[in-house]
Amino acid sequence: MSEERTAWGWGLASVDAAGTTLDVWYPELNLGEAPAESDRPNHNFGTLAHDEADARGIRRVPVFVVSQLDEPISNAADAYLKLHLMSMRMAKPNTLNLDGIFAQLANVVWTNYGPFAVEDFTLRKADVERASTEAALAFASQAGLPAAAPAATVNVFGVDKFPRMIDYVVPTGVRLGDADRVRLGAYLSSGTTVMHAGFVNFNAGTLGVSMVEGRVSQGVVVGDGSDIGGGASIMGTLSGGGKLRNSIGEHSLLGANAGIGISLGDNCTVEAGLYITAGTKITIWDKAKAAAGEPLEVVKGAELSGKDNILFIRNSVNGRIEARYRKVGIELNAKLHKN
């Protein structure tokens, strides 16, 4: 019988007027068996925690959470703990049981003032802006400054179940061109650069130094030294009911506006604009057979999934998709990844 894996820690939960947990922030987490209640360390949230609702209608409540990593998600606090574990690099993608995560997470209005409940957002937005303006006027009066107050504006980043990673976890050695395009639960190894058009979903990410200019879908992992070109995409498991998790090996390149519905092994390249799925018919290039006029083998993309040293191209003369042997993989520019 395998030993149960657990993680634990103090979180600060945002709870709305209906008692719904909108988010939980964990500044620190621990792996292993949780201490007994009498041995638990104290939290250090101080005045960040408040049991009286603020202008958003939100209370911030300290919660001590123990997560069973191999069990389905039990509640929102459990979901946020597992998402934090991945973004903190304490658990790699596809190693935690995330079953039920969508059902346990509330849809939230994410703003520069923190999370709001969707149901009463318009009224709460006015309350926050009014309270902020009044506080600014009071400060100006006490400081002997002109009475004009800057306009306090609630800016909405999105309405979603998942927040931006960067508001909860800032991993070291990483560059992010646009914070909105990396969800909490993304795993970004040191040396990763996510450009402005890149996107990394939760339970997905990079296992080494990587360049991400395209989309890394849920469940997808990218190996060390690989490059996801601008506009490129990798099929995930959230849409269409698919169960197969695709991945990219080391020193591989998914060209600009290319895409895959299969896994790439090490030292592979998919040329720009080429999309390969499991059912794509691919011709195996053989120079000797071609010279002798013999027919070339044709296979489905699924048969090449995960294999190393392949160059996938579309023959510009006859239009067929070909797989050719490739001796070496790509090398990233080291200067771009000293983060």
UniProtKB/Swiss-Prot annotation:
Keywords: Acyltransferase, Amino-acid biosynthesis, Cytoplasm, Diaminopimelate biosynthesis, Lysine biosynthesis, Magnesium, Metal-binding, Transferase
A GO term from the CC aspect: cytoplasm
Record InterPro entries: DapD_actinobacteria, Hexapep, THDPS_M, THDPS_M_sf, Trimer_LpxA-like_sf, Type2_DapD
Residues that bind Mg(2+): 180
Pathway: Amino-acid biosynthesis; L-lysine biosynthesis via DAP pathway; LL-2,6-diaminopimelate from (S)-tetrahydrodipicolinate (succinylase route): step 1/3
Signal peptide: none
Ligand binding (succinyl-CoA): 215, 230, 233, 256, 271-272, 279, 300
Active site: 213
Keyword tRNA processing part of the UniProt annotation: no
Compartmental location: Cytoplasm
Keyword Phosphoprotein: no
GO biological processes: diaminopimelate biosynthetic process; lysine biosynthetic process via diaminopimelate
Catalytic reaction list: (S)-2,3,4,5-tetrahydrodipicolinate + succinyl-CoA + H2O = (S)-2-succinylamino-6-oxoheptanedioate + CoA
Family: Belongs to the type 2 tetrahydrodipicolinate N-succinyltransferase family.
Subunit structure: Homotrimer.
Identification of the protein by name: 2,3,4,5-tetrahydropyridine-2,6-dicarboxylate N-succinyltransferase
Provenance organism: Bifidobacterium longum (strain NCC 2705)
Gene: dapD
